[in-house]
Amino acid sequence: EEKWSKIWSEKVLSNKDSDASFSQVIPPPNVTGTLHMGHSFQYAIMDFYTRYHHMSGKDAHWQVGADHAGIATQMVVENNLAKKDVTRKELGREKFLKEVWSWKDYSEEKITSQIKRLGCSVDWNKYRFTLDEGCNDAVIKAFVELHRRNKIYRGYRLVNWDPSLKTAVSDLEVVRQEK
């Protein structure tokens, strides 16, 4: 397996001279942990499509990357610190951010290793992280444009508030209990 994983990770499927193209973006896994079976299943299907289009003569590109997962990553790092009886407030902003980036590097390395072991036909030279400068700039530009068109706005709405994190959280992050 190691031999073939190395061979495939060094190959870039490309038909640059083709007029036809196919591209897809890997739904970026969060740097909160490692890949699970669902990722493997999805990546196998996406790999099939990329290879199929390449063999059909198209310039096929499968964009690979990882997502920062903001609050979820913060929670993972805080939980790891709690095991050492340390809080983010005790660390201070700079040291805490250093811990977060350290965790990101650790988790990202595990994730990329897993994707490589799956033999996915991605172009590792074009790897992206959602907090890379280009990605971040694109998000800011999109929000500014959506705000300019009145598609998003600031207003009064009910939100799920986490009193310990002191921020709004998504419905997916809420543990509901009936009392």
Features from the language model and the residues they span:
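N-terminal, positively charged nucleic-acid-binding surface of large information/translation enzymes
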Residues: 1-179
